[in-house]
Amino acid sequence: MGRFVAVALLVLLSLSGLETIQHAPKIQVYSRHPAENGKPNFLNCYVSGFHPSDIEVDLLKNGKKIEKVEHSDLSFSKDWSFYLLYYTEFTPNEKDEYACRVSHVTFSTPKTVKWDRNM
């Protein structure tokens, strides 16, 4: 019985330690297909490698939040870091700028990554 209690305590201590670990998210912004002006596409923001799981992600058009955005379920990797995909339909053109803005405890201010149509 004592051995079980010791093992259970060790597991609980290990899990509680995960909350103190913080990893900044890696942010990747890309389109599903190569960009062509006037041709519908999907804008993706893949956020990965972050911990803890609390995060806010916005897709932006000319600095303003895009309202019709979908996202995957929050998932985690084998190292217990988390990842998400946010995406929306869009039609690229020469004048509009697109970006992904992420707020996470590891950032003092939200981080914005612009979409590069050549990537």
UniProtKB/Swiss-Prot annotation:
Q: Which cysteines are joined by disulfide bonds?
A: C45-C100
Concerning InterPro entries, the annotation shows: B2Microglobulin, Ig-like_dom, Ig-like_dom_sf, Ig-like_fold, Ig/MHC_CS, Ig_C1-set, MHC/Immunoglobulin
Choose any GO biological process term that the UniProt entry carries and state it: antigen processing and presentation of peptide antigen via MHC class I
The chain positions of domain Ig-like C1-type read 25-114
Q: Which GO terms describe its cellular component?
A: extracellular region; MHC class I protein complex
**What compartments host this protein?**
Secreted
Signal sequence region: 1-20
What subunit structure does UniProt give?
Answer: Heterodimer of an alpha chain and a beta chain. Beta-2-microglobulin is the beta-chain of major histocompatibility complex class I molecules.
Q: Which family does it belong to?
A: Belongs to the beta-2-microglobulin family.
What name appears for this protein in its UniProt entry? Beta-2-microglobulin
Species, as recorded: Callicebus personatus nigrifrons
